[in-house]
């Protein structure tokens, strides 16, 4: 969680084009996400990842999203990444085999115990919390009940799920996350980011202070 003195970081996810990289960086994004799970409409291959990742300047984190993929596949992509985001049913042992720092995405299904999950994934650099829809590993464009997030989680929380420029200020006030993660909320069409929406989202975050 953040404290009142910390700013909320922003990750723009699902980037597929050079111009979207440029727009996100110019707007002040802290991290850029690339979907490397082939089941997603926003997925890119390794050649495109290499081109896009090379365009990212220093001090902006390059994050790759994976869903239950083989270790060797993740390692191959990870040459172009700074951080791995595991969005499937990966066990703590699966995560621990990786050489790259990682965060674990958790879908907020009924009955989930975030304190227990935090203990299970104790080596994670953070926990990304996303809406739950059966059979869909992420990218639902849906929010969830933010009051279900405990205020005293020890690990950094990255809040995802249905965030837009219209609701991100409320999300920050209510959750006080370390970071927020947006994809569809800054798109003109699936996989195509809108520079104006990116700027509006970053502006809302930068002008919002956690209580």
From Swiss-Prot:
Enzyme Commission number(s) of this protein: 5.3.1.24
Keywords carried by this UniProt record: Amino-acid biosynthesis, Aromatic amino acid biosynthesis, Isomerase, Tryptophan biosynthesis
Disulfide bonds: none
Stretches assigned to coiled coil: none
Single annotated GO MF: phosphoribosylanthranilate isomerase activity
Catalytic activity entry: N-(5-phospho-beta-D-ribosyl)anthranilate = 1-(2-carboxyphenylamino)-1-deoxy-D-ribulose 5-phosphate
Pathway: Amino-acid biosynthesis; L-tryptophan biosynthesis; L-tryptophan from chorismate: step 3/5
Classification via SUPFAM superfamilies: Ribulose-phoshate binding barrel
GO biological process: L-tryptophan biosynthetic process
Keyword Amino-acid biosynthesis listed: yes
Pfam families: PRAI
Keyword Isomerase listed: yes
Family statement drawn from the similarity comment of this UniProt entry: Belongs to the TrpF family.
NCBIfam families per the UniProt record, alphabetical: PRK01222.1-4 (NF002298), PRK01222.1-6 (NF002299)
PANTHER family per record: N-(5'-PHOSPHORIBOSYL)ANTHRANILATE ISOMERASE
Protein name in UniProt: N-(5'-phosphoribosyl)anthranilate isomerase
